[in-house]
């Protein structure tokens, strides 16, 4: 249910980029000052139809640039570009959380031409998502986060505002005990005031889950095992919702159509509830993903590639994606567009995209070590395999593990 947000677990592939830097400088000067040439574009297979129209419009406005649109797999962007950068796409769709790895490996071309536009036109969290070490590398076009889907026949708008009332009035089907709990409940630590890789998500030694707030989070997770309003659900979450076994579940915009099929006009969607870890209600947070386009470091037509990437993430293009696919725009102006704010799921995502409700998923290379370590701690805590007396030691080990850069 993670919709391509999660990155692959492959580690950083070191690539010599000195020659590429020289080529970049040469291609950005002289005759290359005019955006022209042939550019290969990779987009996910399921979106090819939409992008054919967008690319056709781009070529009309930019007759000196010819785009070769090809199907790719955005979730595997780093791996696929690294295989053969010179043969890969000049512009490619990617989840933002691979940017740190790709930048460090010399695989991704910095946004040297449209950095100012990206910063001015998109919300701060989207800009943060495509920025690595104070340099903008990619071009955002959508934000996505998990939201709370619920049955409006079971809950009133007030009853979904706290985890306590949510699980007292009905039952939520969610995953504490299997793979994937890391993505849903890892942000609980940030909800309670902790940091994952520091305040900006770029410090390998900046995770501080091994404190009192972290212990409170583990105790809360353990308590959910005996909460009658919590039903352990993973792949069966949607069927449980449709059958009435559960009344709510947490997922992203990728589940919207399936939830509508399951609940019909009873479907509601809202931002996450608050949680009491023992010191009053705190806003439950989620990871925020930023869908983006990026330019291959080895492109032979950098100006043309950047021109295309910028067009694909423009206000006009983002509105097309919302209408045709359902992507929630990162563009500031569109986030106040009435057509978007009146959409139930989009409205919930816009609220979740605020810093009070989400944390931009870190793009640091070490994040690949976080996922398995976090899953193990959440799963075992929920199942009772970790006793309260061992919480501190487990969190110490978790923090140690998350600072490691995984090996190939």
What are these regions (language model features)?
Residues 82-83, 87-90, 118-150, 174-175, ...:
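A structural signal for short loop-to-beta-strand junctions that line the ligand-binding cleft
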Residues 203-232:
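Glycine-centered hinge/linker elements that transmit conformational signals in sensory
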Residues 96-147, 158-159, 163-164, 270-271, ...:
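Hinge/lid segment of periplasmic solute-binding proteins
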Residues 57-122, 137-138, 153-154, 247-248, ...:
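Extracytoplasmic "Venus flytrap"/periplasmic binding protein-like
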Residues 323-376, 380, 404-408:
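Long, aromatic- and glycine/proline-rich binding clefts that accommodate carbohydrate-like moieties
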Residues 137-141, 146, 164-207, 213, ...:
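Extracytoplasmic/periplasmic solute-binding protein
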Residues 44, 224-301:
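Extracytoplasmic/periplasmic substrate-binding proteins
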Residues 4, 10-11, 18-98, 277, ...:
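Conserved N-terminal structural module of periplasmic/extracytoplasmic solute-binding proteins
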């Amino acid at each position: 249910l993670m919709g391509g947000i999660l990155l692959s677990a492959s580690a950083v592939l070191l690539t010599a980029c000195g020659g590429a830097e020289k080529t970049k400088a040469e291609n950005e000067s002289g005759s290359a000052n005019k955006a022209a040439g042939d550019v290969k574009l990779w987009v996910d297979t399921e979106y090819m139809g939409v992008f054919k129209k967008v690319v056709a419009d781009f070529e009309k406005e930019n007759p000196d640039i010819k785009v070769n649109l090809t199907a790719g797999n955005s979730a595997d962007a780093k791996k696929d570009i690294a295989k053969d950068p010179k043969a890969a796409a000049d512009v490619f769709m990617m989840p933002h959380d691979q940017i740190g790895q790709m930048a460090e490996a010399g695989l991704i071309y910095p946004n040297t031409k449209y950095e100012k536009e990206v910063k001015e036109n998109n919300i701060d969290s989207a800009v943060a998502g495509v920025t690595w070490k104070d340099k903008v590398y990619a071009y955002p076009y959508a934000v996505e986060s998990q939201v709370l889907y619920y049955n409006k026949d079971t809950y009133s708008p007030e009853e979904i505002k706290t985890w306590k009332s949510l699980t007292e009035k009905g039952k939520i089907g969610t995953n504490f005990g299997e793979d994937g709990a890391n993505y849903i409940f890892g942000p609980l630590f940030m909800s309670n005031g902790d940091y994952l890789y520091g305040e900006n998500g770029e410090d390998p030694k900046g995770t501080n889950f091994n404190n009192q707030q972290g212990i409170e989070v583990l105790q809360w997770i353990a308590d959910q095992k005996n909460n009658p309003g919590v039903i352990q659900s993973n792949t069966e979450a949607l069927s449980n919702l449709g059958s009435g076994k559960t009344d709510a579940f947490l997922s992203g915009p990728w589940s919207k159509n399936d939830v509508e099929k399951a609940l019909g006009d009873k479907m509601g969607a809202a931002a996450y509830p608050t949680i009491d870890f023992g010191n009053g209600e705190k806003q439950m947070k989620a990871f925020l993903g930023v869908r983006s386009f990026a330019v291959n470091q080895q492109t032979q037509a950098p100006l043309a590639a950047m021109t295309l990437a910028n067009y694909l993430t423009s206000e006009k293009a983002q509105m097309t994606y919302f209408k045709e696919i359902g992507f929630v725009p990162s563009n500031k102006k569109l986030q106040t567009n009435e057509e978007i704010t009146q959409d139930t799921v989009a409205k919930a995502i816009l609220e979740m995209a605020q810093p009070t409700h989400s944390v931009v998923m870190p793009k640091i290379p070490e994040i690949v070590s976080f996922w398995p370590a976090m899953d193990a701690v959440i799963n075992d805590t929920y199942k009772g395999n970790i006793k309260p007396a061992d919480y501190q030691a487990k969190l110490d080990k978790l923090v140690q593990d998350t600072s490691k850069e995984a090996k190939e």
